[in-house]
Amino acid sequence: MIQIVTVRSGDSVYSLASKYGSTPDEIVKDNGLNPAETLVVGQALIVNTKGNNYYVQPGDSLYRISQTYNVPLASLAKVNNLSLKSILHVGQQLYVPKGTKRAVESIAYLQPSTIPIKESLVNATRAINPFLTYLAYFSFEAKRDGTLKEPTETAKIANIATQGKTIPMLVITNIENGNFSADLTSVILRDATIQNKFITNILQTAQKYGMRDIHFDFESVAPEDREAYNRFLRNVKTRLPSGYTLSTTLVPKTSSNQKGKFFEAHDYKAQGQIVDFVVNMTYDWGWQGGPPMAISPIGPVKEVLQYAKSQMPPQKIMMGQNLYGFDWKLPFKQGNPPAKAISSVAAVALARKYNVPIRYDFTAQAPHFNYFDENGVQHEVWFEDSRSVQSKFNLMKEQGIGGISYWKIGLPFPQNWRLLVENFTITKKG
C-alpha cells in the first residue's frame, strides 16, 4: 500500500526503502527523484509499503487515515484494537484493511505558450492521459463578430486525447488583448445575431475536432449580464448534438450575494441546473500579486465546496487544484514584481539548493519554506506536495465531490498522479 512519509534528518532513499519494505528504484520513480541528489528534511515522499501495514506520520488521526484509504473509521479502529478517540503516536504501526475506491472524473488544462507546442509539453500531456477523463485545451478566444480565435495545433492535441480514451474539451474564453473582457462578453450576450453565429461556430469547431465537451470560461462578466449569461448557456444547451456535454468555470464563491465584479455574474444555482458539470477555481488565495500564503488552503476550499453543494448536486462539481506554487521575494509590498510560478519538483530542488528544511502548515495543509538567494534577498515559497493533495482528495471524499480539475499541464508533480489513482477510480468516457 502507498503511504506518505516525511523525510527526517539522516534519511535516504535506501534507508526509507529498507524501513518501509519498498525498493529504492520504486521510491525514485514514484516521486520523480534524481538518485544522485540528497533528500530534503521535511520533504514528503510516497512509499509503497509491504502488505497493509501503515506507519503513523505527523498530523495523522484515525479519521484522516480512514479517509485516505477508503476504510470505515469504526472498522479501522476495531481491527487495531483502538477506540475512535485513540491518540496516535508517530511511528506507530497500524493494519489498514483494503478499502473501496469511488469513481470520479478528472480534467487537466493544457495552455501552450509557444508555436509550435514544445515537445516536452506534448510528452507531458501524453504521460498523464491515462489519469484523465477530459483534456481541456486552453483556449479558443471569443471574437466580437461571433467567430473564434483558435489555439495552435488543435487537431494534434485532440488526437492525443482521443488516443488515450480521453475527451478533448473545447474551452472558450472571453479573453481579448490578453485579458478577460466584460465588454466583449456583453456584445455576445446582448446581440442575438452575433450570439447565434457564435454558437454555430462553436458547434462546428467541436464536431470538426471531436471535442465532445463545450466549456465556457467566461470571467469578469459584468454583474448586469448575469441573467443574459444564464440565458446564453440555456441557448447553447438546447443546440448541443447528442452525446455532447456543456460545462463552465465558476469563480470561488461562499454565498449567493457575494459582491464584486468577479463574482456576481456567476450564478451557481442556475448554472448547476443548466450545465452538466462545473469547474470550481478553488485556488489562488495565494497569488502572484498578493502576499505569500498557501495557494489553495484547505479551509477556504472547503467553504467554497460547501456553498457549491448547497446550489447544485455535488456530483456536478469539479474541484480546482493547482499544480503550481509561487516563490515570493520578501518583504512583500504592493506593486512588487509578481511572484514566480514554480512546480512541486522545482520547489523541492530550491530547498535542496539552499539547504533549508521544508515546513508544513497543518491548518492550511500546505508545505512552505524560506531561503536567502545569492544576493541576500529573502524568499518565501508555498507549493503542493503529496500531503497537501491527499488532504484535498480526502475533502473530495468527505463532500462527495464529482471530480477534480488541474491547472495546468507542464508543471511536474508525479506524486499527484500516483496518489490520484490510489484514492479513486478515474472514469473514462472516450
Swiss-Prot record:
Protein name stated in the entry: Cortical fragment-lytic enzyme
Organism classification: Bacteria, Bacillati, Bacillota, Bacilli, Bacillales
BP term (GO), one: carbohydrate metabolic process
Function: N-acetylglucosaminidase involved in cortex peptidoglycan degradation during germination. Cleaves only partially degraded spore peptidoglycans. Recognizes muramic acid delta-lactam residues specific to spore peptidoglycans.
GO molecular function: chitin binding; hydrolase activity, acting on glycosyl bonds; oligosaccharide binding
Family stated for the protein in its record: Belongs to the glycosyl hydrolase 18 family. Chitinase class II subfamily.
Entry EC number(s): 3.2.1.-
Activity profile over pH: Optimum pH is 6.0.
Domain GH18 stretches: 104-430
Source organism of the structure: Bacillus cereus
